[in-house]
Amino acid sequence: AYRDSRFKSRDRGRYVITGIELRLNKVPACNVSYGPLKEHFAHLPADEVSPAAVRERVIAVRQSKLPDPAVLANAGSFFKNPVVSVEKAAELKKTFPGLVGYEQPEGTKLAAGWLIEQAGWKGRRLGPVGMHSEQALVLVNHGGATSVDVLALASAVRRDVWERFGVSLEQEPILLP
């Protein structure tokens, strides 16, 4: 599944991944279903979309949304997009018409970045850490942060999203002791 694996569930904490082996198709199949890719390649027939073009576009999209870790320390997306029941999503949509959600087989996946932004955390800092000003889902270290700082911010964001929406955010990075 997208951004998930057995190492985040049944084998969590049992292994440290030090290498991988890939089996690649000789005939590429480009998946451009992600919104910005779909829009960018909409004018082309599917068989004219090359892996190199998709790669270049993915890099451009990521650079426009995410801070460069070499410039501003971060771990990328810090919270998973929560999945709620269809009923809960409909209830939230009545109160928050701009709610961003995507139907899934198991319910509705909500955009955690949108929830965090609406809870007032986009671009906001708590000491040396904060949520990125361009992408509210990304927790950044402005310099000198400790794990205590990171966890305090994560807890505050989680609390505020829960209080505003009644939705729990799950941390995505796995922390090592």
Describe each region flagged by the PLM.
Residues 1-140, 144-148, 164, 168-177:
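Phosphate/pyrophosphate- and phosphate-bearing ligand-binding catalytic cores of soluble enzymes
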